[in-house]
Amino acid sequence: VYVYDPADRSVQRVLGGIAGASGLALSEDGRTLYVSDLGSRCVWAVDADARELTAGGKNCKSFLSGLPGYPGALALDEDGILYVSYRWARSSWLEKNADRTLLRSIALRAGENMQQKLFGLSADAPCAEAVDTADGSWERTFTGREMDGCTAVCPAGSKVYFGAAGSASLLSARV
């Protein structure tokens, strides 16, 4: 994860040591950057002013870990609720082959059909979850949406909108 400063046209690394930063969200006060880590199935909370951190190292804490799916897009609402969308469901095949980097790498680069067979979300799998950033409590799980994965999430007022892979329409849920 890198930060670009347009004033002096510089690029600096904020966070390294992650296996796929698939989503970013910045807290309303601008102090905390949340980073979804696709490879480790977790969300990191990072001091937004920090530089050159390593995931799991000093001053970089895991905000959520052991998630039921592979986190993708992140979004924060005005109440400090973090919405985590799941790009894929937790895969027993990937879990079993966690230490086989080559196999995992090939699977994550496979075509859409193969990925759907390995990681696709079932109708009862969570496609997104809502977490209170103040205390880390789980607020809500969004399930029952048979889709290839949730690629985007956007809270707006009393609704949350979901961009579903393979869907031509936008899905929503009341909160």
Predicted regions, residues:
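A short beta-strand motif characteristic of beta-propeller blades
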Residues: 10-15, 59-64, 137-143
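Beta-rich, blade/repeat-based domains predominating
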Residues: 1, 13-32, 65-79, 117, ...
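Conserved active-site loop/cleft motifs that coordinate metal ions or position small ligands
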Residues: 83-85, 129-130, 138-143, 152-154, ...
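Hydrophobic, well-ordered secondary-structure scaffolds
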Residues: 33-35, 42-46, 51, 65-66
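Short loop/turn segments that connect beta-strands within beta-propeller blades
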Residues: 5-9, 47-51, 132-136, 174-175
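Loop/turn-rich, solvent-exposed surfaces of beta-rich toroidal or solenoidal domains
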Residues: 68-140
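Conserved beta-strand positions in repeat-built beta-propeller and related beta-rich domains
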Residues: 27, 33-40, 84-88, 118-123, ...
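Structural signal for beta-propeller blades
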Residues: 1, 41-43, 90-92, 128, ...
